[in-house]
């Protein structure tokens, strides 16, 4: 048998879910207030989530306050 992987093996490897990926259906309804998020979580929200301008400004303000309190 050759060293090359079959198409099936390649497809299977690409379809593997990363072990670090965790989805909990209960997280959907448990949206905690932005004040309770860590700075890292808030930064992630700013960078990757689609949020309105007012919410974006609120999050920036919270991050600034948290950084001052460190």
UniProtKB/Swiss-Prot annotation:
Family to which this protein belongs:
To M.pneumoniae MPN377.
Task: Name the chain's protein.
Answer: Uncharacterized protein UU416
Q: Per the UniProt entry, what species is this protein from, by scientific name?
A: Ureaplasma parvum serovar 3 (strain ATCC 700970)
């Amino acid at each position: 048998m050759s060293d090359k992987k079959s198409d099936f093996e390649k497809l299977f490897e690409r379809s593997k879910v990363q072990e670090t990926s965790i989805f909990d259906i209960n997280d959907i309804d448990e949206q905690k207030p932005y004040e309770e998020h860590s700075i890292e979580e808030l930064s992630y929200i700013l960078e990757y989530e689609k949020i309105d301008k007012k919410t974006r400004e609120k999050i920036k303000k919270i991050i600034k306050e948290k950084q001052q309190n460190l």
